[in-house]
Amino acid sequence: MSTARRQVDLPEVTISESRGIRYLHLDTPWIQGAMRIDDPLDIELEYVQRMMAWMLFREPAVFADTRAVQLGLGAGAITRFCLALGMQTTVVELNPRVVAACRTWFRLPSDTPGLEVLTMDAADFVAEPRRRGSADVLSVDLYDHEAASPVLDSQAFYRGCRDLLADGGVMTVNLFGRDASFDRSHARIAAAFGEAAVHLFKPTREGNVVVLAMKQVTFPEPDELARRAENIQTRWKLPARKWLRMLRLKLEPDPAPLPDLPPA
């Protein structure tokens, strides 16, 4: 997924299909998003599934009252899923070609009372004072069109992301664990949120590492987390039991809410 203002031409969008899956590309063979044509609500890519792990930390009964912000549209998998949950959803994507392609090829609806798509720089969005505390869930996937490195990756940006979250909010970020920039990105997220508030999945086969960063989240008891994981897996067909196994060792020792950080 791609968004951020730079003094370069925005890449063209290309589409490919294979074995019932439609893929989004930006001038390169790198996959920027995917959709199963006969089941658009199915989240096809493993790392994108993991970006929904925030579901473990909210009761299903409040999903429809949850405010989601997505930085980087990709093929709209997260957007479609959040809309299906009834969530108020805001998407920020710099490249209007990506937005147009998603509406033509990836079942992205036009703006409605529940969906707002903004064609703008994600750095500007998180810096707007009026946005503070406006998101319960924040999904960040901001790699460039060559999937080389995040286009927004400063500590100031991640502090802006934290400011965007309401108390109890969760940010999920896609990084490449095999990339030389990973340790730097992880350190900046930890500096912005606090080390104890940051949790990592293991890399996917493709090398994607999803990072969870939390703002004053009180972890449910292990039995409650297990119940939620079972419900997510049964109802929405996401591998939440696996998420819990991957995250549990780090989550259990730190159940207390985190202290707030001073503003950047």
Q: What is the predicted function of each stretch?
A:
Residues M1-E17, I31-P40, E46-Q49, F57, ...:
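SAM/dcSAM-binding transferase cores
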Residues D9-R22, G169-F176:
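An acidic intrinsically disordered interaction segment
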Residues P60, R107, G194-E195, K237:
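Residue-level recognition of short, structured coil/turn motifs
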Residues P29-G33, Y143-E146, M171:
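A short, flexible beta-alpha/helix-coil linker loop
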Residues A4-R6, S18, L24, D39-D167, ...:
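The AdoMet/dcAdoMet-binding core of the Class I SAM-like
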Residues E12, G86-Q88, T112-G114, G168, ...:
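A generic structural signal for alpha->beta connector loops
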Residues Q155-P222:
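C-terminal substrate-binding/active-site "lid" region of AdoMet-derived donor-dependent transferases
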